[in-house]
Amino acid sequence: MAKYNNNSNASKATNLKQQVVLPTYTLDSNLVLLPGIMYNVTFSRFKAAALLYRYKNFISQVSIINNLLNEYDFNSGNTNEEERFEAEQKLEQPETYHEINPSVISPEAVEGIKEFFQYETGMKTGRGVEKGVKSTQNDAIKEFDWLTLAIIPNLEKIKNPETNSSAGDGSSSSKVVTVARIVGIVDDTTNIKLTLQAITRGVQIKDDGKNNHHKRGLKTNEQVIGIDWNHNVSDLKGKFTTLQKNYQQLFQSIDKFLIDYREALDYNKNNSNNNNNNNNNRNGNLSLIKGNSTTYSNNKNYDDKPNQDIKSQNLLTLNPLANALYMQLVGSKDFNKAFHRLQKLFSQVIQGDEYKIDNETYLRLVDLTCGILPFPNFQKLALLNEYKLDDRSILINEMMSQLIQIFGNLQTNTSFVNSWFHSEATNIQKATVVANQLKSIRNLLEGMTKNRPIKPNKRNSGPASSAPSFSNGKTPPARPKVNHHQDGSHGHDSDYDNNDDDDDGDEDLKAIFNFIKHKLPTISSLSADSKRLILKDFKRVKASANSPGGGGNSDFHVLRNYLEIVMDIPWDNYVTKFKSNKDIDLKLAKKQLDDDHYGLEHVKKRLIQYLVVLKLLGINAEKDQALQSKDEENSKNPAHSDSNSNSNCNSNSRSLTKSPTSSLASKTPSSIVIANNDETYLAKQQAKTRNQKSITEAKTNVSTKMVPSNESIQVSKNNKSPIIMLAGPPGTGKTSLAKSIASALGRNFQRISLGGIKDESEIRGHRRTYVGAMPGLLIQALRKSRCMNPVILLDEIDKVIGGNSGGVNKFNGDPSAALLEVLDPEQNNTFIDHYLGFPVDLSQVIFICTANDPWNMTRPLLDRLEMIEIGAYDYNEKLIIGKKYLLPRQIKRNGFPVTKVGKNNTGNQDEFIKINDDTMKKVILDYTRGEAGVRNFERRLGTLCRFKAVEYCEWLNKDIKNYNPIIDENDLPIYLGVPYSSGDVTTEGTVGVGVVHGLSYNSDGSGSVLVFESIGFDRRISNGNKEHNGGDGSGGNGATLNMTGRLGEVLMESGKIGLVFIKSMIYKNILKFDNNNNNNTNRHLLLDKYNNLDIHMHVPMGSVSKDGPSAGVTMALSFLSVLLDKPVPSDIAMTGEITLRGIVLPIGGVKEKLMGAHLNANIKRMIVPRENRKDLIKEYSRSIEEAGEVLDHHLINDLIKDNEDNEFKLTQVEDYYQNKYGISLFYAKEFYDIIKIVWNEDEVLLKENNSRLLEYHI
């Protein structure tokens, strides 16, 4: 037996009744909301926006609601003329005017929602009302908790079949409401589906002014609601026993009914010898009882075991009552789920002695039973109106008993009919019964056809369509309305509205028909030819559907899929964060970018520039529109000025808000218990009244100027969206930066990964002739984003197979060439997807491409992109990023309860994990060494957080006494293991001959120091004749060079060039070899040594491939060191390409190489090409901006001008890097400059021949 608990938690509270002011809303449908159930209710976009607008001050953080509210301008009174007209014509209720021009909730309603939330929290937590109020006074109410309102049933639409009157007739109409909360919202681009959670009952209390708390300030859509939180049920055990008995009988009756009904349906499919056990195991069987059930109820007036022939030919399916009950029981999957959930709740209550049935559970079972089982709405309303608990218990038992009796009578009547029809009736009587059934069905169908609502004549549908406006705002000359569109220039209205029996068509075609009829004429981004092609395909679909065999042919399915995809594209739907272009908040956008990413000022500048251009275009467009309207008004005929002015006013007002015509939707199925489709009625009526105007604008080619339908969300067509490529090493934030850009602009974001794509059809789509053809990735991205101006990230564009990558299959096309049209601002406004077959405007899409090695791309594609290079981060930047972004994110991801407070939203994170700067710097240098980005750095921080999460849980479980949130350097080996080898091993040691330090740019985007080791062997020593030929240099076969270390072809060629240049220096007698000899002897000695020298050069870390020309000067200096037998100082690193004339050419990756030199403790001086100083000036200015300091633009200009001189005088750049990295910078324009920096000039070069150096200078 179950245990009963009459003392609920609510009884501990001293005051269980409250009166609060709540916003109210009256449904348009006959839906009745019972507490404890979640309802999915479908609204038109306008109605949903009007309802949510009342809470706009509390839901500003919910993006989907903000996007919906941006479609309508409820602040101005001239934007909803047609909505006002339709509401007055259809609703005819003064209390519904607030849905036309809604207002925000009053302060009294705000306090009412707070008080209700406090009471509700106290009841949920079991702490009582008083403790619940105290505990929630300082807690912030979440966004969706504010969406609390009182739902008033629509009594006019709930009919009582016994009295044939509505529930609102008479003076005894109930004042009971359902207090509900909006807990979910889904935007399907046509309608809005709100999920309502019914919480409790309430009673409307008339505000007579005596109550000072609610004396003033209430609005027409607000009401004082009395709520009783007392859930004490007298004689709980007895009442639950009665409810349990009735529910068992009812569930057995339903289960047996479903079994018999399915047997009747499956008569032609199943063998007549199948028994009830097999039927219980069929798919979709809503079986509630384990084992067989032989009765509908306890009524035994019929035969429990009828004849097998009679049972196999059951006439149950001919009974209208049986059909109605069956459709309600198995008509939707959501009902199945709810039905099984109700059964599970009852089984949990009655199983075991440890489970306690309390008052709240019992009352919830009462409401759930009424809400889920197939009771009519007038009975559900009656149960809702039973505010007293005892009366509610009596009513639910009576309702269940009536339903049990209905199932019993149905079985008795069916058994009688089966027995008579199969055993006693003659063939003539059977035929008569069947004929009467068919006649009744035919009469019913004829009645349904006659009673169908007559379509209004759109040419005479009221003021909204009496004077349709053309696209330029002008009104056409008056003419008889019957000949309004018979000029023949663009066809007739029958092209879009030529089917008066659209309701008789296929259910699958209704949504397509609504799109063709109502939405397609209003699409401004489609040309007339494109609309003609779509309309032609639609006619083919209708012809195929109406042909013999229906839609069974393949052409029908291909065309239907095509039209469904065309319908799903968000035509003319533009989403933005700002109300209008002129209202763009540049500071807010800049703050959003700064909050998401550190540094990257050059990228942020480009986006701010784009927003500034949009803002200026919005301001100028408003001025131009005002001037144009004034000029048109002055040029009009004065006799028609008044009417034209009114027409223009209406046209302008409609252009400021998104037309609800686009909100027409096909009926959506119910989600949990009931989905209310009648909420879209107003939107459908509005679409009908404006259909004629839309068709006129779509077909009339009067003006080519596009007038935006919603100035607040549609960007200017005169401005092309930027097409940016972010080029940089992995892990530098390119992908996340693209997401931040979309967030700053308030646009939807879509990512397309292009890595490995080798088929052109992936970009352009497949032609419809192929089986399973689909649009390309770009059209699919538009469908997913639900707007025509998203931010689309083309990730890894340099890894597209094709173009310069090689290996492309000619039969599949070149996908990189297909991107040329997409990424060209002058062409992408007419991008043609092979599947669609007509142009699509992509000019408002912001394309952001990412690449690691952009030079792998084809030159035409690279020329179309605005490339912004993102370099590697130095460890100071990584330190700031780790403290400000990565560590707080990892702490939150690993489950620590951090509160978002403070300047950087770090909250109380130091209570859980605290890492000082030295420890974090050690993680960067020792555990993520050589990384250009911060990806591995974040992984390491995540590892630290996971270790600390384990310790924190052990402390919570009291397994350890204390929890220490601090992580110092000594803890890193415990958590992260042994650090990586530093890589400085090869650079350590004493100064050696032929050992020179070079700088490299690694494939991961980082920089490092490479050691070039050269050893020379004099062949004269091995032959024993060092003084061969008296030192005239004529002996030997020339120097030989052998290079190892997995070197590339370009690097090996640079080494040979360097060696040849050393030889040219010997021939020109520039080098000094022996101070005791004259110049000629000096040259002969050097040449003789050179010709008998075998040089072997090796670059350590042989497993790593190395290539590039930037090591030319390094290898040349190494060879010269071996030849002159002079060591090179170990604190110098250099980079630069060398030519045969000794000129040092500029190289790339200077910043990364500078960082690599800085991370090596032995390097104090760095030699770079002279031409690379301008790169250092650029990096210097960028570093100043990213550090947040004010950049002196006059100084930058002075630095650039000073750099043009051979001997520059301004050294701010060198001083900056000396202070920041501890590296002294030297510049070399030719190889002789390197010799002067490394060695003493007098020791290496001959003074007599110094003047000859000018011959080789450039």
UniProtKB/Swiss-Prot annotation:
Reactions catalysed, semicolon-separated, are: Hydrolysis of proteins in presence of ATP
Biased composition regions of type Polar residues, renumbered to the chain: 459-474, 656-670
Enzyme class at the top of the EC tree: hydrolase
What the entry lists under InterPro entries is as follows: AAA+_ATPase, ATPase_AAA_core, Lon_lid, Lon_proteolytic, Lon_Prtase, Lon_prtase_N, Lonp2_euk, P-loop_NTPase
Annotated localization? Peroxisome matrix
Q: What is its EC number?
A: 3.4.21.53
Q: Is Nucleus tagged as a keyword?
A: no
Q: Which CDD domains match?
A: RecA-like_Lon
- Segments carrying the region annotation (Disordered) are 270-296, 447-503, 627-670
Q: Where does ATP bind?
A: 728-735
Q: Which GO terms describe its biological process?
A: protein import into peroxisome matrix; protein processing; protein quality control for misfolded or incompletely synthesized proteins; protein targeting to peroxisome
Give the compositionally biased regions (Basic and acidic residues). 484-495
Q: Where is the composition biased (Low complexity)?
A: 270-285, 641-655
Annotated Lon N-terminal domain ranges read 22-404
A Gene Ontology cellular component where this protein is annotated is: peroxisomal matrix
Q: Name one Pfam family in it.
A: LON_substr_bdg
Q: Which GO terms describe its molecular function?
A: ATP binding; ATP hydrolysis activity; ATP-dependent peptidase activity; serine-type endopeptidase activity
- Keywords, ordered alphabetically: ATP-binding, Hydrolase, Nucleotide-binding, Peroxisome, Protease, Serine protease
Q: Which residues form the active site?
A: 1110, 1153
Give all residue intervals belonging to the Lon proteolytic domain.
990-1241
Recorded family membership: Belongs to the peptidase S16 family.
This molecule's function is given as: ATP-dependent serine protease that mediates the selective degradation of misfolded and unassembled polypeptides in the peroxisomal matrix. Necessary for type 2 peroxisome targeting signal (PTS2)-containing protein processing and facilitates peroxisome matrix protein import.
What is the official name of this protein in its record? Lon protease homolog 2, peroxisomal
